[in-house]
Amino acid sequence: TKEDILDVIDYARKRSVTIVPEIEMPGHATAALSAYPELSCTGGPHEVETLWGIHKEVYCAGNEETFVFLENILREVSEIFPGPYIHIGGDECPKTRWENRPKSQKRIEDENLKQEHQLKSYFIKRIEK
């Protein structure tokens, strides 16, 4: 719960420890995409992964609602955690879901990107603001 998180933050503060929360994106997002399949490239359905690994489901970088959702999450996290940083992951993001998907390909075209690797860079740069 939020109260539990605040207890952990208080415990850390008393010991001069800064907690850096991590919200993974654009990959490692299957749990969120199970709840919000419309933010994926395929529209789901998705199941929460129970095994460690790199999974093919990622947030759709061509869907504006993806950014609205993630910006709201980051805003809430920044209001809870007093530290200056939020880790957004960014590693291990397969780009296969962005290939040949109309929204992702349109974003690539609209932003004058050359391919899906640049779309990932666009995603990270947009979120880091």
Model-derived segments and spans:
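Substrate-binding cleft of carbohydrate-active enzyme catalytic domains
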Residues: 1-129
